[in-house]
Amino acid sequence: MNSLLSVGDQIESGIYRFHSRFNRVVNFERHGRLVSVVDEQIGPGPLNIVLRGGFSLSPSEGERAGVRGPFSLQGSGAHCALKVRGTLLPSAFPPLKITTSSVVFAAHRFTFSLRQRYHSTFDFDPGNLHCFHHNLSIFGELLTECAPSKSLAFLLDETRLKNFRSGFEQAFADRICRGAHQVFHGHLLEGIRSLKGCGLGLTPSGDDFIAGLLIALNLLQELRGQAFQPTADAIFGAAEGDNIFSNTFLDLARRGLLFGRMKDLLIELMTGSEASVRKATGKLLAIGASSGADLATGFFLTVHEQSRPVERGCQRQPMDRIG
């Protein structure tokens, strides 16, 4: 049995050099484009190669300064684990080699067929709008109830601001609140620039929020037939920076290309039961310390704000007009 489960549909053939590694992920880069080899817990995505089994990649903190070696893929068939020992320079980590039908990772070759290509898009059915809006309200309630305490869910429930106590945390929350207000009240790109890079981690909270916003715009474009792509492109231009992780994630979101857990959630929002929406939401919120929740907050607020009628005197600007 092949240990390679899926290959993202945005992965191009070529040789990729080692970039960075984390507990369940090894990242490779080519021409400013990241491709990630991940385990089943991370799951599929447009630029993910999913291998069956777990990675033994201590420490859990990522590093670029060096990698541990030599390399061994232990097990075969149903189980495959990468073991890494010793110390090597990044240049000594074997490159990732990809063709139209094979992947060479850590000196091991895996073949794949079209059936193993992960498809990062799906067709939306505008006829399911009633179900979608019902499930969206459930999703919003789950965000408020279940999101991590230090996530951006305080934008949905301001009582959560009590979790931000230090001067740094309060300044962070103030900047997020200001940026989100600008985004939804006529100063879209100014708000995006306020949110850009705001927070800690590989993909700061502000960037995760923007990614959720971009995914929402693609969904609204499909459901309503409105031309949101120029807005999404402008948002990406304002949000793009020096962080290759954020840039990669934001570019995929701009183009409506979804990783597995987000795609599963959208499918359940369109057609699922309350129980299935709860399950999909839980899986999304489990990503990172708060990344999944921050993405979810940006997605929910954008769909919610763009779906409600504009009240007289309200400065909210539809997002198909760039401000």
Describe the function of each predicted region.
Residues 63-64, 85:
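Glycine-biased, low-complexity coil/linker segments
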Residues 241-264:
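Membrane-interfacial catalytic/cofactor-binding modules of polytopic membrane enzymes
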Residues 229-241:
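Long, charge-rich alpha-helical interaction segments
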Residues 261-323:
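Acidic, carboxylate-rich catalytic segments that either coordinate divalent cations
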Residues 1-55, 73-181, 185, 189-190, ...:
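Phosphate/adenylate-binding glycine loop and adjacent helical scaffold
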Residues 56-60:
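Long, compositionally biased low-complexity repeat segments characteristic
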Residues 209-214:
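Amphipathic alpha-helical elements of HEAT/ARM-like alpha-solenoid repeat scaffolds that form extended
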